[in-house]
Amino acid sequence: MKNLFYSFVSGSEYLVLVALDTEGCVYYASAGELNSQASMVELMEKDFLKAPEFRVNSLNSASSSLVNKKSEVKIKDTLEKFKSLIDFENKDEKIPYKVVFGTPLQRKVWDYLVNELPVGSISTYQKIAQHLGMPNSSRAIGNCVGANRIAVVIPCHRVIGSSGKITGYRYGTNIKKTILQNELGSKYGSTITN
């Protein structure tokens, strides 16, 4: 069984629960309102029921035998990068991650998001479906995007409806709007329809 450790990273406008290994590699990240820690932990625990090969421990209560000094440095470095990313200090911050959830199609969609949607860009479910050779599968693509378990790092927030409106987001459309406003800057108003 592999041990993972979770901690919260507070941004100026929202909170992220990050689960990572002793090398600082992220396996899970969920976003939530600033006062939603308990519900975020509950959701994470529910999600990890589907991955019994992992044991997720609170970083604050982790035994010193599980996290040594070298690991502490790596974990702290990744959490600081996450803080920089969600506070919009470094929109291009590269954070190591490993996908442990998802079907082959979901992983294909997530790879597309990571590789084809850089900071400052957006796409629609329909355009992604067309690009992946599935032109009549916008809804399936939407389900794949919504199944992402590594918020912000895998940029599911950069996918909007064909109408230009912000559509569903596992962590709430207000958080999606906040992230997009900060990533797009002055382009937000001309790109997103309310």
From Swiss-Prot:
One of its GO terms (biological process) is methylation. Its main location: nucleus. InterPro entries: MethylDNA_cys_MeTrfase_AS (IPR001497), MethylDNA_cys_MeTrfase_DNA-bd (IPR014048), MethylDNA_cys_MeTrfase_DNAb (IPR036217), WH-like_DNA-bd_sf (IPR036388). PROSITE patterns: MGMT. It catalyses: a 6-O-methyl-2'-deoxyguanosine in DNA + L-cysteinyl-[protein] = S-methyl-L-cysteinyl-[protein] + a 2'-deoxyguanosine in DNA; a 4-O-methyl-thymidine in DNA + L-cysteinyl-[protein] = a thymidine in DNA + S-methyl-L-cysteinyl-[protein]. It is found in: Nucleus. Its EC number is 2.1.1.63. It holds the Pfam family DNA_binding_1. Keywords: DNA damage, DNA repair, DNA-binding, Methyltransferase, Nucleus, Transferase. One of its GO terms (molecular function) is methylated-DNA-[protein]-cysteine S-methyltransferase activity. It comes from the Eukaryota. Gene3D superfamilies: Winged helix-like DNA-binding domain superfamily/Winged helix DNA-binding domain. The keyword Repeat does not apply. It is an enzyme of class 2 (transferase). DNA binds at Y125, R139, S162. Coiled coil: none annotated. The active site is at C156 (nucleophile). One of its GO terms (cellular component) is nucleus. Involved in the cellular defense against the biological effects of O6-methylguanine (O6-MeG) and O4-methylthymine (O4-MeT) in DNA. Repairs the methylated nucleobase in DNA by stoichiometrically transferring the methyl group to a cysteine residue in the enzyme. This is a suicide reaction: the enzyme is irreversibly inactivated. This enzyme catalyzes only one turnover and therefore is not strictly catalytic. According to one definition, an enzyme is a biocatalyst that acts repeatedly and over many reaction cycles. Belongs to the MGMT family. This is Methylated-DNA--protein-cysteine methyltransferase. The gene is MGT1.
